[in-house]
Amino acid sequence: MVKINGESLEIAGRTIAQYLATTSYDIRRIAIECNGEIVPKAVYETTILQDGDIVEVVSF
């Protein structure tokens, strides 16, 4: 399970980009933190979410 904004989801093994494709977030207007670290947009395609990750998505 991956916890995103407090909600547990069965998305371990997917990339951040794959997760975002299932949402209505505007990728140009978000910031993502994974386990306390800001994730650069340049690595959304290659960052694989792992079981136990805690992710915060902030839109602005």
What are these regions (language model features)?
Residues 1-60:
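Ubiquitin-like/PB1-type beta-grasp interaction modules and other compact soluble beta-rich domains
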